[in-house]
Amino acid sequence: MAGPLQGGGARALDLLRGLPRVSLANLKPNPGSKKPERRPRGRRRGRKCGRGHKGERQRGTRPRLGFEGGQTPFYIRIPKYGFNEGHSFRRQYKPLSLNRLQYLIDLGRVDPSQPIDLTQLVNGRGVTIQPLKRDYGVQLVEEGADTFTAKVNIEVQLASELAIAAIEKNGGVVTTAFYDPRSLDIVCKPVPFFLRGQPIPKRMLPPEELVPYYTDAKNRGYLADPAKFPEARLELARKYGYILPDITKDELFKMLCTRKDPRQIFFGLAPGWVVNMADKKILKPTDENLLKYYTS
């Protein structure tokens, strides 16, 4: 048999023998612990349930909100005006300042040597377009007009007069064009659309109330008469006091003159074409009826 424990083991056993035994008499919560109070019956909301003694407040027969005892209430007495009438159907345009556009160009997120449209702006994280929230594109504003130095061919949906002047002063070109919600979703997210294997649809024409804006050369509308653009550019240059550059002698003249057809969504891709992402090919329709439909 083993002999009696000696050293540290013996001292540990002696210490345990002297400790009190665990029993109901010496149990207590841990230091810092909190036990939720138990709510007995009839506590806080007992007897009258907090409604008081009799009357309409206890019986729940109080008049509705806005009732004034029988007289004409305030919300009917005062006439209303439709300031917000049709607010859920109004078109919204995300602002894009010239300062922001110059910033995107300086970082290389937008290529000024190519025509700039919504596809470039969205892919460069310059703007966020949400067609489901009534976004209809981008509005070019004049903030940063004094510091804008890039020469660009940009297509937006709305543009202020000073923003147009700032771009044309540097030899650039501005075009305002309308996109219906379906075309807007496709031009902002081209890759998911191409992966579906569907033909590129025709872009719809603007509604009746927007036709005057997009047919005016002063707004650089895409439906305006091209013969009126030189006169409108010269008139704007005289108004703001700058010399209009001759873009016909510019080495980027071909890029600056590139414009989309009113029915076209992408640069270089016509309606009716199918982009095959797997084989990296473009399929074009050959049927006469399809060609007639997509060119009409």
Curated annotation (Swiss-Prot):
InterPro entries named among the record's database cross-references: Ribosomal_uL15 (IPR030878), Ribosomal_uL15/eL18 (IPR021131), Ribosomal_uL15/eL18_sf (IPR036227), Ribosomal_uL15_bac-type (IPR005749)
Transit peptide endpoints, chain numbering: 1-21
Superkingdom, taxonomy of origin: Eukaryota
Keywords, in A-Z order: Mitochondrion, Ribonucleoprotein, Ribosomal protein, Transit peptide
Gene3D superfamilies reported in the protein's UniProt record: 3.100.10.10
UniProt GO BP: cellular response to leukemia inhibitory factor; mitochondrial translation
Predominant localisation class: mitochondrion
Entry GO terms, CC: mitochondrial inner membrane; mitochondrial large ribosomal subunit; mitochondrion
Pfam families: Ribosomal_L27A
Localization per Swiss-Prot or TrEMBL: Mitochondrion
Single GO term (MF): RNA binding
HAMAP family: Ribosomal_uL15
Family recorded in the similarity comment: Belongs to the universal ribosomal protein uL15 family.
UniProt subunit comment: Component of the mitochondrial large ribosomal subunit (mt-LSU). Mature mammalian 55S mitochondrial ribosomes consist of a small (28S) and a large (39S) subunit. The 28S small subunit contains a 12S ribosomal RNA (12S mt-rRNA) and 30 different proteins. The 39S large subunit contains a 16S rRNA (16S mt-rRNA), a copy of mitochondrial valine transfer RNA (mt-tRNA(Val)), which plays an integral structural role, and 52 different proteins.
Protein name: Large ribosomal subunit protein uL15m
Biological classification of the source: Eukaryota, Metazoa, Chordata, Craniata, Vertebrata
